[in-house]
Amino acid sequence: MQVSGIDHVNILTDDLEKTASFYERLLGLTRAENPAVRMGIAGYWMCDAEGNPIVHLVDRLSAPGRYDEYRPGEVTNAVHHVALRCEGFDDTVARLKEMACEYRVNDLQHLGLRQIFLADPNAVNLELNFKGD
């Protein structure tokens, strides 16, 4: 077996609509039906411009018993952050300001890389990487 990349990130939330709106407004992802909805679990797949579901959102409260031990917003222990390849640095900064989100910029000129660090509504740490942008 050989791993070719990360397929998606799954995020549990107690506020599905707020979280989906955050990923739509900031990252330009679009909502798609989550096939698990048929199993009674509410959620969305947040897709990139090519239709790839890269962030899965699950309403933790719609699945009693299944996710009871997980608490959005609490420390995630070993998983520190999720890094995403992005385009449109200036537009992203403008959207962050418009959304009144706290963020930090790291400019690694020697690597041709600019980064934005922030947290989503569930305290998931995000690293947005802009290469040559």
Predicted regions and their residues:
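Mid-chain, well-packed structural core segment of small domains
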Residues: 75, 81-89
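Vicinal oxygen chelate
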Residues: 1-2, 34, 93-133
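N-terminal beta-strand motif that seeds the catalytic metal site of vicinal oxygen chelate
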Residues: 1-17, 79-82, 132-133
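Conserved beta-strand in the GNAT
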Residues: 55-58, 127
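A short, acidic/glycine-rich surface segment
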Residues: 40-42, 64-69
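Exposed loop/turn and edge beta-strand positions of beta-sandwich/beta-sheet ligand-binding modules
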Residues: 5, 40, 78, 112
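Core segments of cupin and vicinal oxygen chelate
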Residues: 12-54, 106
